[in-house]
């Protein structure tokens, strides 16, 4: 998050929420070019906000965490639950994006709804100048049109125009 805020897609914004969606879901909050850790060092930990009470079990012990709906492994698991054969996230999208079946359309629709609800909660609370998406799942192209539209549907303000941008520095920016 810090590298993107200082040198990447967020360099022209004062308040940046950096999102990581990959094997897990996490984030970082940058305020005026400084990382905000919070008192308990959990600021930005949106992957463990509850999206669905009594939802899917998370490794953290809680139920219904965002991570259990948005991470790459959760997407692959849900695909199998819908009756699809075990595939990687990349294989699912490559196989069905241009030739969708009923399972793929349901899988995609649920992901977009969950992405929209989860990220809009962050925007409603933090009200950042920009959100930068990173991690392997951020490479899904439909996040940048339909995903953003799903976020906008859930924002409190009908004037929201918070930029939701792909990262510029790649997955190794924090190294």
Where are these regions (language model features)?
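Conserved catalytic-core motifs of eukaryotic protein kinase domains, centered on the activation segment
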Residues: 41-42, 144
